[in-house]
């Protein structure tokens, strides 16, 4: 037991040293309004709503230069409701994102953890409900997933370097069902082109 405690302290000390050399950003947003609704079951209603024009969230993102063109990165992000102070998800604290990654300018990016699927992550840039977890702005049928933002647990994401405005990516989510390797697994691929000249 004594050896385990010493090893744990050594690991904590190493983590502290690494953190001191890292770039870590704390970010977030809060959106609260009081809409007046003229007809709710024949009556008027004034209430308090969260995340009307942008999501309520807080998060941490960071990176560390490892040298040789490599960079370690991570993101932790929690969505919540300002009006009642509760998280969006009762089962996952970092319900919007929780991943670690390794970035290379020449080889691309590899990320592991809970990540948004490419459908919502890619199309959200152009949708009228582009702010994820915005319950008031979404497309009919929610076919692009923007109103719900489906993060994929236990997922591996690979993104290619940008090549002349083009970038491709692939995502695989492990189902983690014992004895059924294909159950609950997910696939997602994307290709995107962006250019300042268009």
Model-identified regions with their sequence ranges:
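Bacterial Sec-dependent N-terminal signal peptides
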Residues: 1-8
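Short, Φ-rich (hydrophobic/aromatic) sequence segments
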Residues: 8-10, 27
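Repetitive helical segments and hydrophobic/amphipathic motifs
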Residues: 11-13, 168
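Sec/Tat signal peptide C-region and signal peptidase I cleavage site
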Residues: 15-20
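Outer membrane beta-barrel
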Residues: 21-36, 46-174, 183, 192-196
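An N-terminal domain-cap segment
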Residues: 41-43
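Short helix-to-loop capping/linker segments positioned immediately adjacent to catalytic or ligand/cofactor-binding
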Residues: 177-179, 189
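Conserved adenosyl
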Residues: 186
């Amino acid at each position: 037991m004594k050896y385990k405690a010493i090893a744990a302290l050594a690991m904590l000390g190493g983590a502290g040293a690494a953190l001191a050399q890292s770039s870590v950003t704390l970010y977030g947003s809060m959106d609260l309004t009081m809409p007046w609704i003229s007809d709710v079951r024949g009556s008027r209603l004034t209430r308090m709503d969260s995340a009307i024009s942008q999501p309520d969230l807080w998060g941490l993102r960071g990176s560390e230069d490892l040298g040789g063109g490599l960079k370690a990165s991570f993101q932790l992000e929690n969505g919540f409701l300002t009006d009642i102070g509760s998280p969006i998800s009762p089962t996952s604290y970092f319900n919007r994102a929780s991943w670690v990654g390794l970035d290379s300018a020449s080889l691309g990016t590899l990320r592991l953890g809970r990540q948004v699927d490419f459908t919502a992550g890619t199309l959200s840039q152009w949708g009228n409900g582009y702010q994820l977890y915005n319950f008031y702005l979404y497309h009919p049928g929610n076919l692009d997933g923007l109103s719900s933002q489906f993060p994929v647990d236990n997922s591996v994401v690979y993104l290619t370097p940008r090549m002349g405005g083009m970038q491709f990516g692939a995502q695989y989510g492990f189902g983690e069902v014992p004895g059924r390797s294909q159950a609950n697994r997910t696939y997602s691929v994307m290709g995107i082109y962006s250019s300042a000249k268009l």
